Amino acid sequence: MLNLTINGKNIQVEEGTTILQAAKDNGIYIPTLCYDEAVKVYGACGLCVVEAEGIPKLLRSCSAKCSDGMVINTESDRVVQSRKIAMELLMSAHNGDCVAPCQLNCPARTDCQGYVGLIANGEYESALKLVKNKVSLPASIGRVCPHPCESACRRKNVEEPINIAQLKAFAADLDLNGEKYIPEKAEATGKKIAVIGGGPAGLTAAYQLAIKGHDVTIYDMMEKMGGMLRYGIPQYRLPKEVLDSEIEIIEKLSVKMINNVKLGKDFTIASLKEQNDAVIVAVGAWKSSSMRTPGEELDGVYGGIDFLRSVIQGNPVDIGEKVAVCGGGNTAMDACRTAVRLGAKEV
């Protein structure tokens, strides 16, 4: 066994033990970035350096072996200064690509921490511009998004997650109630693009493509644009006046919108391709999910999405006084609340 001293503590280790391992085994912390027990020692980060009496150079503790009688200091001024310089060098070449968990959890990869910070500083217009880099309908989406960003928010480890989705809607509402932000368009490319479907995906595609200078036309089978935002989400959750205002902004980017036309009946992908340089299919998912159980075809049994769409379009739906809802997701809860609003006494 070898006898040595680390930070005034006398310890014994087996021959061949590194200084880093000896320190770790005895509860002495030495920082390191590149060390991993599962791989060959690299020693590149320079953070694990220590000072040994009688040795002029600092030693990389991840690779330097212990020797008998060694006296080691892991916290001297010289060691601390060396580690500071090593970290500064590492960070000087860092591309700043560390992404916050809220952004990683967002399907659109919205810069959540960025716009939350701007809102906190009162920079509402800058916050909106940052949001609209990814989300073209922030006032609408901010109201109905299931906000997976908040489930990843690290603030919940202290108290509660930041209300990220509502902050997005807040910045967008300020814009809609004032002088609306219309992004600057790039020079016209001469390219024509057809978008099939005027829901959130189609509208977002049209918004982004128009900004890039393309000539965009949206084709939709319904009377108005909006897709499931309009026909699948009740008014109490998403006021259609808000959705209309956001769609108007997209129209002001010279996006043409054609309603009451259906793929396969009024046009085909091939016919659109003849007139355009590209075709984007964004038709959405309009069918209710089947439970694959007997009795689904009986009178008085409705799919959740079909039920909500009928109510939103003003079509009469006879639900009686007692309603059973199978499911517990967003559509199911919307169906529950809508049934109560239609007069159901028990849901």
Where are the regions a protein language model picked out?
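Redox-cofactor binding/interface segments in oxidoreductases and associated redox assembly factors
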Residues: 281-282, 303, 325
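Rossmann-like dinucleotide/flavin-binding elements
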Residues: 196-219, 258-268, 273, 287-289, ...
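Short alpha-helix immediately C-terminal to the canonical SAM-binding loop
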Residues: 226
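A short, gly/pro- and small-residue-rich
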Residues: 293-309
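Ferredoxin-type iron-sulfur electron-transfer modules and their immediate structural context
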Residues: 1-192, 240, 279-298, 344
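Residues in the short beta-alpha loop(s) of Rossmann-like NAD(P)-binding domains
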Residues: 222
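Conserved beta-strand segments of alpha/beta enzyme cores
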Residues: 71, 215, 254-256, 300, ...
